[in-house]
Regions:
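Short, positively charged and aromatic/hydrophobic N-terminal segments
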Residues: 4, 11-12
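Beta1/beta-strand and adjacent pyrophosphate-binding region of the FAD-binding site
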Residues: 16-28
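Glycine-rich FAD pyrophosphate-binding loop
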Residues: 37-58
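Active-site substrate-recognition segment that forms the wall
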Residues: 59-63, 67, 71-110, 236-247, ...
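Dinucleotide-binding Rossmann-like beta1-alpha1 core, especially the glycine-rich loop
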Residues: 60-183
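Short beta-strand to alpha-helix junction loop
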Residues: 118-131, 154-164, 189-190, 202-221, ...
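Helical element adjacent to the flavin cofactor pocket in flavoenzyme catalytic cores
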Residues: 163-175, 194-254, 258-261
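C-terminal catalytic lobe of FAD-dependent flavoproteins
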Residues: 179, 308-309, 333-335, 349-457
């Protein structure tokens, strides 16, 4: 990737108002664009794919505020144990890759209680504000996405696991979150779809769920109504900055330069390939997840669920049922592992009745961007004024998308953001304080083959 520099005057002669260029049309990119456009800013959003093709479409649809990061005590040891098990919930393909080995070591060092406590303080502070923004956008723009704020269930199969499930829920109480413990009999009275094997559940009352693809399409339409220009099938090859080192736009693989007074990188797992040449080296791995969607299942749960022992998410959407889950860390662009899709219904059948009676209507696989310390990267890039990044949310991207977009939009406009997020500060990954002199030799942001969306409903 070549970093272009030009005289500052070349960039702004025709710009009647500040223009922001956003790379990535996922939930973080589009919510950033939405809030900027509502404030009267000119915005252009670029994406190599279509709106709703990535993780913002394919996620489980659970807006689970107070969600734990990946860096939990014991997770790294389990990951190493599962490394050679292709059917494990977390599968890491062994390979002689220096970046992966460095990521694994850093990840392991962060899987401790002290780090988790610090992360949770910040992640929990983002929870209620992000749902308020979801509800504001949905109400103002009239988005029909089956949004329901009725919590989610941690459904437990084995009676001996109920105590640990409840203990985990209690850790969120000091942060203002509530929960209810439900017996298996009560759960079946509420939703007869649960099998007799289920011992009970912990009901996280404050969260919500929605159809993420419908939300994304509605959000994209809202952005367009506000004047946001959205260009899909547009590959970004590199960033531009002026002679003073300020971000000044991007250039595409077609040789086109798109000018802007600010640039926001929200390209998911591909973000680091762009930010690295601007002095920000984010240690990120793509963790592929899968979903299957069914119609015709006789009875659906009354709200979204996570199945405690198998880590499968189960979400009702418009009278259909989505099964989502698994983490698969391996090189970008490798073929799907069909056994990972098969794991979803296999992991759900002991909990939910009638899945075998449903008709599969969609399947999907895509990457969740996972940082080595478990926290997202949100804010200004040190050493390059006008450059911002919002990436690395792992499985929290859909949930935290609106609050991330609000924080980024306020930063772009020079306004105080609604939250201070020191744990998510990009400065922790700055190369020599930022703005590296390394301008040559990086892989293009779109170098990996596209991940297809599979069958779409």
């Amino acid at each position: 990737m070549r970093l272009h520099t030009r005289p500052v005057r070349a960039y702004y002669p025709r710009m009647s108002r500040p223009r922001t260029v956003i790379v990535g049309a996922g939930v973080v990119g589009l919510t950033t664009a939405y809030f900027l456009a509502r404030a009267g800013r000119e915005v252009i959003v670029l994406d190599r794919d279509e709106i709703g093709d990535g993780a913002s479409y394919g996620n489980a649809g659970l807006l689970s505020i107070g969600h734990y990061p990946l860096t939990r005590p014991g997770v790294s040891w389990r990951g190493f144990k599962w490394m050679f098990d292709r059917n494990a919930p977390l599968f890491i393909r062994p390979r002689p890759d220096a970046d992966l080995l460095s990521w694994l070591w850093t990840f392991h060092r962060h899987c401790n209680q002290s780090w988790l406590d610090r992360c949770m303080k910040e992640l929990c502070a983002m929870g209620f504000p992000t749902l308020e923004l979801f509800e504001e956008i949905i109400a103002v723009e009239g988005i029909e996405c089956d949004y329901r704020r009725d919590g989610w269930l941690d459904v437990v199969l084995k009676k001996e696991n109920m105590a640990s499930a409840e203990a985990e829920a209690k850790t969120l109480v000091p942060h203002g979150y509530s929960h209810t413990v439900i017996s298996g009999d009560e759960l079946r009275r509420r939703s007869p779809c649960f099998t007799d094997e289920v011992a009970g559940a912990v009901w996280y009352r404050d969260s919500a769920h929605c159809s993420p693809g419908d939300f994304m399409m509605g959000l994209g339409a809202a952005c367009a109504r506000l004047g946001v220009e959205i260009r899909t099938s547009c590959t970004v090859a590199g960033l531009e900055r002026d002679r003073f080192g300020k971000a000044a736009g991007i250039h595409t693989s077609r040789g086109e330069t798109i000018e802007g007074s600010a640039v926001v990188i929200t390209a998911g797992v591909w973000s680091d390939a762009l930010t690295r040449d601007m002095g920000l080296d984010i240690p990120m791995q793509g963790a592929r997840g899968y979903h299957l969607q069914y119609e015709g299942i006789p009875q659906l749960p009354f709200t979204g669920c996570v199945l405690h022992e198998t880590f499968v998410a189960v979400t009702p959407m418009h009278e259909q049922l989505r099964l989502a889950g698994t983490l698969e860390i391996q090189p970008l662009g490798r073929p799907w592992m069909r056994n990972r899709l098969d794991m979803l219904p296999a992991g759900a059948k002991r909990y939910i009745k009638g899945i075998e009676q449903g008709t599969q209507v969609a399947e999907w696989a895509g990457y969740r961007p996972c940082t080595s310390d478990g926290m997202p990267v949100i804010g200004a890039v040190p050493g390059t004024p006008g450059l911002f990044v919002g990436a690395g949310h792992a499985m929290m991207g859909m949930t935290l998308g609106p609050i991330t977009g609000k924080v980024l939009s306020d930063m772009v406009m020079g306004a105080p953001p609604p939250l201070l997020l020191p744990m998510a500060d990009p400065a922790r990954y700055a190369i020599n304080g930022g703005s590296s002199a390394r301008y040559e030799g990086s892989a293009p942001v779109n170098g990996a083959p596209r991940e297809t969306a599979g069958l779409r409903s």
